[in-house]
């Protein structure tokens, strides 16, 4: 019964965002999170809000949402995905060192290629072209189903030429 109610609320959140009712979506998401904390629906609502916040360049609140999911989720794979998103947002904030710490805090498992690519982006932003190239090559040698190999090949090609 409780999961059904949480699912219904989550559906309302997504519908509000799909109608571009950002304020309504935020309000519904916060209500869901408060009413059904520590549920997968609360985590997903936080992720939906964080995505909208990133799109609207509200990076600090997005970081807070992502950290909230990391603190509450019981899903190890979701936590790995959230860490990737958090590192990307931190990089967008110009906090490359924080992004590296976020990436290095866990063993990425099946997401190793994606972690290596983001690590490459962070190292490149820090001016470490050799480190970035090494990370991109590591990503390219990983599971090609989890990464955009075309984009990765462009990144590798650009760095290898310079």
Feature map (PLM): residue ranges:
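Short extracytoplasmic
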Residues: 7-47
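TPR-repeat structural position
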Residues: 22-23, 59, 96, 129
């Amino acid at each position: 019964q409780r999961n059904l109610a949480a699912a219904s609320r989550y559906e309302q959140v997504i519908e509000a965002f799909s109608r571009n009712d950002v304020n309504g979506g935020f309000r519904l998401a916060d209500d869901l999170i408060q009413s059904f904390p520590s549920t997968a629906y609360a985590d997903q609502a936080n992720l939906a809000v964080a995505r909208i916040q990133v799109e609207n360049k509200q990076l600090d609140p997005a970081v807070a949402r992502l950290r909230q999911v990391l603190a509450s989720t019981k899903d190890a794979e979701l936590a790995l995905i959230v860490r990737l998103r958090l590192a990307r947002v931190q990089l967008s904030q110009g906090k490359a060192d924080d992004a590296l710490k976020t990436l290095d805090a866990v063993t990425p498992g099946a997401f190793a290629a994606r972690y290596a690519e983001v690590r490459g982006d962070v190292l490149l932003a820090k001016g470490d072209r050799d480190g970035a190239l090494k990370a991109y090559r590591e990503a390219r040698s990983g599971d090609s189903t989890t990464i955009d190999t075309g984009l990765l090949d462009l990144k590798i090609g650009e760095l290898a030429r310079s």
